Amino acid sequence: FQPDFYMPFAGRYVLGGEKSKLEKKRAKIELDDAFDYFSNSSTINHELHKGVILNQNSIFDLTTGKSNQKYIPVDKEQKRNYARAHLSKLKYDYETDKLPSLEDFLVLIPKCFERFNAKRKQLNFSSNTQIFITLPENKMLRIPSNGEAHQIVSKKNIEEFDRYLVITTDFRLLLRIMSGPKFAHWNNAEIGCHIEFNRSPNYYSPDVHTALQFLHL
């Protein structure tokens, strides 16, 4: 693979609303940082492969090798100030929802688990890791990753297992997620830092999270 041009990618979004307080703890780089990294890489022949960085909505002509605009670097301080003054005050859509009851989730869980388990089988994935999702009334949804049936348990049941993933999020958002992707989606909620994870051991399992994205109607 010998491209004439390459473009680095970096997530340029910021957290708004209540979760904006987590922005400083989020692993992130600016597009400028990614471009500088590749521009200074000794493994790239910069005479043959040229890095390209563009403003939003600008155009790059592959024939001439030029953009229609001069790139303007991100002003990090201005970006932080705008997020603090404006974005942090935004409300999430789900914050206007009525707080759901335990019964609201009990109606959804069987079908959601069915989809989760189908994806787990498709991935040919089985694990001793137990997934616990926090529910109203101090209950937890226990989802085994090995094909066993799901259960509604109390929080103290977590202590019975050595390998687990505990998931906590706003019940209103959780109800939207489990109601289906047209309302909200696990992956988007995770990227936006709306979900808290507690793992034992502290190991990220891609297969668990892939299957988890199908825990919805």
Go through the PLM ranges and name each one:
Residues 1-82:
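Binuclear metal-ion centers of metallo-dependent hydrolases, dominated by the metallo-beta-lactamase
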Residues 60-217:
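Feature captures hydrophobic
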